[in-house]
From Swiss-Prot:
Organism: Pseudomonas putida (strain ATCC 47054 / DSM 6125 / CFBP 8728 / NCIMB 11950 / KT2440)
Functional description taken from the UniProt entry: One of the primary rRNA binding proteins, it binds directly to 16S rRNA where it nucleates assembly of the head domain of the 30S subunit. Is located at the subunit interface close to the decoding center, probably blocks exit of the E-site tRNA.
Entry keyword Ribosomal protein: yes
Protein name: Small ribosomal subunit protein uS7
GO biological process: translation
Amino acid sequence: MPRRRVAAKREILDDPKYGSQILAKFMNHVMESGKKAVAERIVYGALDTVKARKNSDPLEIFEKALDAIAPLVEVKSRRVGGATYQVPVEVRPSRRNALAMRWLVDYARKRGEKSMALRLAGELLDAAEGKGAAVKKREDVHRMAEANKAFSHYRF
């Protein structure tokens, strides 16, 4: 931890097409090696595909998918005596979004479609419907927290 002061959070500018700050943050998660233009093309391509398939606002579907993926609780390791316990803790809102975006991108990359835009669109649509690998990850995390509920008195 820094000894001086906590660094101020930098303001993320809204994305140019939809004017959404969450979408701009998501593009930063998709971006690799600083290639923002490539990330924009992938995300906008995915949203266009979603719009073509569902005939509704792609930003609404994106936000619905993020809500379906974002975890409410997670487990953190806590060492007590000689044993390490998995202690369930509530996830703060900023971390909820960050985890949801990270899982969405990770599981989209593992899909089988040809282009990343199609993979991302597929994972977004699956997540919005409450299925898909990213939603399964959330359920696994919740299940893990539920299984370790007995250790919740070891708070951080």
